[in-house]
Amino acid sequence: MANVLVAMSGGVDSSLAAALLQEAGHQVTGVTMHLWDDDEQGLRESLCCAAEAATSARRVCALLGIPFYVFNYQREFRRHVIEYFIRAYTHGLTPNPCVECNRMIKFRALLDRARALGFDAVATGHYARIVRDDCGRYQLWRAVDTEKDQSYMLHMLGQADLARLLFPIGEYTKQQVREMAAARCLPSANREESQDICFVPDGDYRNLLRIEAPESLIPGPIVDLEGREIGRHRGLPLYTVGQRRGLGLGGGEPRYVVAIDPARNALIVGPVEALNRERFIVTDARWVDDAPPAETFHCQVQVRAHAEPLPARVSAQPDGRWLVELERPQRAVSPGQAAVFYDGVRVLGGGWIARPEVG
């Protein structure tokens, strides 16, 4: 049996993960990562990095009779996640802080610390599955519960990571998880789920930008696809590709943000049809098998956390980037978001959607 460190948010998923591992005979220790001061932006108690999370996790560990610790990662979280988040928006990109938090905090800093402390593995309450093939290689699969599947957020994990990770609840649906937690009298069985972006109060990232980067909110032109100025924006970081509301363009045909051009401080808008993309570039690709399947391969690509995966052809480019060609157009492919490649339920890898060249 293994000595396992379980990352616990105080919620039902990580609580049940700890309980299942203990029942399987493993030596289990719980840990909550303190990422963000509750008072810094007025966070709700339900958020995964709030102090209430540590209190809830401690209560679960006491019930299970296992050790519990809190690791402070506030400095790393600000540097690798919050500053990345702000920097992306100020450069006209739409960031995905949960992917970056997984990459830099949960599956780098925590894995490194667990190794240094002598733990054999780290477990989390993510909805995903780790499978070993006939050759002993690790594969990352979608969760059984496709509605809750989080494999998109984990695409950056490689062989060395997967060898030391456990996802105990990936084989269950959310309903089953709640029922199993209730059967074990876990206090988190009916706890409210944490929000996706834990450091954004009330879900409005614009308030964070106004506080953290007010100098980036420089007004500029809103232009149509022909380059004609038709309005003024309040600062590029306040807008995302696909946005319609809040443009202040008055009546007439609905217009959407089609592209963001930081070089000209311009917001480019057009009809809904202009949002469709059939080709885009992916940068900084990482592969679950530590290498791409081939220089050119067919797969399904997912461009947002809950988007439908679409058939695509992916081909390596001379500059190290990857060209993705979709079989049918996808609306609002947002630069800065992750594009994740799948072969059915199996994650192949993924990278970041690059900004298209703007004329």
UniProtKB/Swiss-Prot annotation:
Entry function: Catalyzes the 2-thiolation of uridine at the wobble position (U34) of tRNA, leading to the formation of s(2)U34.
Location in or out of the cell: Cytoplasm
GO (cellular component) term, any one: cytoplasm
Sites where the protein binds ATP: A7, M8, S9, G10, G11, V12, D13, S14, M33, G125
Annotated EC: 2.8.1.13
Name of the gene: mnmA
Interaction with tRNA (site feature) positions: H126, Q337
Protein name according to UniProt: tRNA-specific 2-thiouridylase MnmA
Entry's family note: Belongs to the MnmA/TRMU family.
Provenance organism: Chloroflexus aggregans (strain MD-66 / DSM 9485)
